[in-house]
Amino acid sequence: MDLGLKDRVYVVTGATRGLGHASARALVAEGAKVVVTGRKEDAVAEAVSALGPDTAAGAAVDNADPGAAERLIAAARERFGRFDGVLVSVGGPPPGFVADTTDEQWQAAFESVFLGAVRLARAAAAELGEGGVIGFVLSGSVHEPIPGLTISNGLRPGLAGFAKSLADELGPRGIRVVGLLPGRIDTDRVRELDSLSADPEATRQAAESRIPLRRYGTPEEFGRTAAFLLSPAASYVTGVMLPVDGGSRHGF
């Protein structure tokens, strides 16, 4: 199936590793062009090299920077001549339980994970035309809190609510808004979380036993799902929060 992504241009944040990078790879594989972001210039340059300099451009920015959104959209237009959508993927806040997290951690995560995403979505909404799309990489914690991820549990559901409101507001202009809710995907982040336990391998096995497909997902599987949702092939899909979790969410 042709997803209709050829020569379309997307900004993908947090794309130097993990789910953001997997999504950028899937978009490029389908013929799209991407502007990828990350905080470190060397990591951004490495990601651009891996994706191909003819199909990818990079920008070292911090999502918490109020001016980042406008710069990224301008970079897409300057490098590739158009702007068709954005995928907001931000690394997870530090793990911790309620009693362990500080005001400073909450504030930093709010600026980067929440407010940075809101700013980029607002800027994209002002620039996109009919057929544009705004995507958010969120978490299964949108539906059910994950033990030990208190800050993420507090912020991700709020972003899902923001995305739903945005979908209602932008729908009449033909602009879609979608969310992806990853479960246990085999990324550095998930392996780091597993490693916090006394027995990481036992922790992984226990987690896999609760997943109907009995395994962690791969970044490539997530990336292909993201590419489809961002593509014209999903032109009648908006306002959804799609679990990519191997069936871990048992509710409807």
Residue ranges of each PLM-predicted region?
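Substrate-binding pocket helix/loop in short-chain dehydrogenase/reductase
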Residues: 97-98, 102-110, 207
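Conserved glycine-rich cofactor-binding loop
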Residues: 9, 16-17
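Short, flexible catalytic-loop segment of classical short-chain dehydrogenase/reductase
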Residues: 177, 181-196
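Short C-terminal tail/terminal secondary-structure segment
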Residues: 144, 227, 238-252
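Catalytic loop of short-chain dehydrogenase/reductase
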Residues: 135-159, 163-172, 184-185
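Alpha-helical segment proximal to the catalytic Tyr-Lys
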Residues: 126, 168-172, 235
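Rossmann-fold cofactor-recognition segment
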Residues: 51-66
